[in-house]
């Protein structure tokens, strides 16, 4: 074990280097093997994870809570109904208090600026469980899943069909760091925000008007719901706009013969993806969901203990 010399947070995918991701992805493989072999591994014995939820979730809560338990620690769940966060307590004050009573903090919230402010005033590592702008833990799990099934992602093509949301922007950061092509296709009005795409990332991003063309030669096709949390009022308008951006068998046929399909879930069959695709032989969504558990264990272990 080589404990970190200073506090490190995980707020965006770009917070870690290529070399750190190589370690984390290999460590995820090792921790998953321990889990499958019922091997006890408690490097975080008596450590406490605070989980702060301003946005509800099944997979995020379950994977973090089970993960810290499997590493020998325990979790405390907080939401805006159960804490002063929902009653106007300044973020800076909450960060000071919560970080003095826990060892690591995961936050699932709205604006990225909230978690950035929290981390600035935290005395312990902070992990982004999801914000409107980024979802790094999910993309880390997706990449680990791809590697499990198909080997290194470097030099491959990942196609995103759908909204320019937190997943898409996180994939863009990952493409630059890990060295793969990112194809993006969305209807007019739902395109990428240029402000959210760093100049250094642009060579890795290729935008297509036609989703079929975007899928051409892809090694991975992935998508998400058309209406993310907080945009429910736009649901009907989005359904009309995204009609041609449902991932279909025809799109998968344009991809590589052994292309994978992923979706971060929950999914709406018949909207962003055909049932035949998500339930088909190219889909790895259940492995993808499980792997949130293993990559987040590797992440928490790394932030608190360093390398083994």
Curated annotation (Swiss-Prot):
Instruction: Indicate the family of this protein.
Output: Belongs to the aspartate/ornithine carbamoyltransferase superfamily. OTCase family.
What's the top EC group for this one?
Answer: transferase
Reaction equations catalysed: carbamoyl phosphate + L-ornithine = L-citrulline + phosphate + H(+)
Where found in the cell? Cytoplasm
- Pfam families referenced in this protein's UniProt entry, alphabetically: OTCace (PF00185), OTCace_N (PF02729)
Annotated GO CC locations: cytoplasm
The entry lists its GO molecular-function terms as: amino acid binding; ornithine carbamoyltransferase activity
Q: Where does L-ornithine bind?
A: 166, 224, 228-229
Q: Name one GO biological process term.
A: arginine biosynthetic process via ornithine
Q: What is its EC number?
A: 2.1.3.3
Name assigned to this protein: Ornithine carbamoyltransferase
Function per UniProt:
Reversibly catalyzes the transfer of the carbamoyl group from carbamoyl phosphate (CP) to the N(epsilon) atom of ornithine (ORN) to produce L-citrulline.
Supply the alphabetized keyword list: Amino-acid biosynthesis, Arginine biosynthesis, Cytoplasm, Transferase
Q: Which residues bind carbamoyl phosphate?
A: 57-60, 84, 108, 135-138, 264-265, 292
User: Which pathway or pathways does this protein act in?
Assistant: Amino-acid biosynthesis; L-arginine biosynthesis; L-arginine from L-ornithine and carbamoyl phosphate: step 1/3
């Amino acid at each position: 074990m080589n404990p970190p010399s200073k506090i490190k947070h995980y707020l965006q995918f770009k917070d870690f280097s290529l070399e750190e991701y190589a370690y984390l992805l290999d460590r995820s493989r090792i921790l998953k093997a321990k889990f499958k072999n019922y091997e006890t591994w408690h490097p975080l014995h008596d450590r406490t994870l605070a989980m702060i939820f301003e946005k509800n979730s099944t997979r995020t809560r379950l994977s973090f809570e089970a993960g810290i338990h499997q590493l020998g620690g325990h979790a405390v769940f907080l939401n805006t109904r159960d804490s002063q966060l929902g009653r106007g307590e300044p973020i800076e004050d909450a960060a000071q208090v919560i970080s003095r009573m826990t060892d690591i903090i995961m936050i699932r919230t709205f604006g990225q600026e909230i978690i950035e402010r929290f981390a600035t005033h935290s005395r312990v590592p902070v992990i982004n469980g999801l914000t409107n702008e980024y979802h790094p833990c999910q993309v880390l799990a997706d990449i680990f899943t791809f590697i499990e099934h198909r080997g290194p992602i470097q030099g491959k093509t990942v196609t995103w069909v759908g909204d320019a949301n937190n997943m898409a922007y996180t994939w863009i950061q990952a493409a630059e760091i890990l060295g793969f092509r990112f194809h993006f296709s969305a209807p007019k009005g739902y395109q990428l925000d240029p402000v959210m795409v760093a100049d250094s990332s642009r060579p890795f991003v290729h935008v297509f008007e036609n989703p079929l063309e975007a899928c051409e030669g892809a090694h991975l096709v992935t998508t998400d719901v058309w209406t993310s949390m907080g945009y429910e009022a736009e649901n009907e308008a989005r359904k009309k706009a995204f009609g041609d951006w449902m991932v279909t068998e025809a799109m998968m046929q344009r991809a590589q013969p052994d292309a994978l399909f992923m979706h971060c879930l929950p999914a709406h069959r018949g909207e962003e993806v055909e049932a035949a695709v998500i339930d088909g032989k190219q889909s790895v969504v259940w492995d993808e969901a499980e792997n949130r558990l293993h990559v987040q264990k590797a992440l928490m272990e790394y932030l608190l203990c360093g390398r083994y």
